[in-house]
Amino acid sequence: MRGKLLIVVLFVVAVAGVVWLAQRRGALTLPGTSGSGGAPGASSGSQVTVTFVYGTEKRDWVEAAAESFRSKHRDVDLKLVGQGSLEAAQQILEGKIQPTAWAPADSLAMSLLESDWRTKNGTALFGTGEDAPAPLVISPLVFVAWEDRAEVLAKLGGGHITWKALHQALSADQGWPAIGGKAEWGFVKFGHTDPTRSNSGLQALVSMTYDYYGRTQLTVGDLLDPKYQAWIKAIEKGVTRFEASTGTFMTDMVRFGPSRYDLALVYESLAVSQLENAQGRWGNLKLYYLPTTLWSDHPAAVLQGSWVTSDQKKAARAWLQHLRSREIQEQALRLGFRPADPAVPLKNQDPSNPFNRLGPYGLQLDLPPAAPSPDGAIVRNLLSMWTRIVPRSP
């Protein structure tokens, strides 16, 4: 009996010795310890959690990129949360969500949050250097329209679809016949998203305002002008519903044809994904570019909130670097995005690249000059003005 007890004691001592040596050499991380503390991607017994909140327009691209990232970074627990840009900005401000990194659809949403965050907390939410906001992919705002309707509007706008031409069309009580269209087309039916909920709707409002004033430098006083407000209201009267999702417009245009929308304002990437599906159903659906380009630059940044640890920042940087790598940037092309990396050409030998084949549908490589984004204070007042003058269904 004593012999058996001695064997058990010796076994326990041996195991304890092995564990002690392993810990001394850093080869074993026990539950509850911080791990090796090395760079993201190093072997570790525990994972660093990175919560990445992103605009849903790039869901397919982000999810595909996450698969390859996870295979290389086993020590990073990457959590993806797709959410509308303006909704996410408000929830971050209110503390309802606390992401490690954020990538809205456009810098407008980021500028709005940065302004509101400074006002509320007196600190910066976004960093500088490697943590500063920088684009992942880019996509311009475009009109997508049925070709026969677009030709009438372009004639009215001197060869282009402009907001002034659209204002005239939407204000006509006699509908399409008043501007040279067919009586069976009825009233002009235009669509864009709710500016208070969706980035593309906010961009639409910015674009209208730039076109009205003929300049991109705005003041709060410009937004208080009654004539300007009446002009905006006349355009919005022709929007039958303010959807929360830009993708809804493309789906509905293909599904219901011009009975639902004659034209809509969407991201180029979304239009590209549906153009070929639409052909032959209701006529030709094509892209038309705004006279001044507004980019959705899909900026991403590691947040400087108190809830983000140094290990999480390291892991988040590795994730964003992965998204900006050449391989992942080239994958974005197949989904209709323009790579943020200027070294990645829009045209290549990939047969699945839409930029190689969709020129006949209006897709262009070279675009009109780009307009700058307004600052956060202008954006906040623009949204306040819109909610005051535009009636919406509950």
Where are these regions (language model features)?
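Ligand-binding clefts/hinges and TM-proximal coupling segments of bilobed small-molecule sensing domains
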Residues: 161-189, 323-350
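Short helix-loop capping/hinge motifs at secondary-structure junctions, enriched
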Residues: 148-155, 197, 211-219, 306-315
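Ligand-binding pocket segment of bilobal, Venus flytrap-like solute-binding proteins
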Residues: 203-288
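Extracellular/periplasmic juxtamembrane helices and adjacent flexible linkers that interface
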Residues: 1-31, 305-394
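Periplasmic-binding protein-like
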Residues: 129-143, 229-244, 279-308, 313
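Extracytoplasmic/secreted envelope proteins and their assembly/folding machinery
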Residues: 59-66, 86-89, 107-110, 114, ...
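N-terminal segment of the mature folded domain
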Residues: 2, 26-186, 194-197, 383, ...
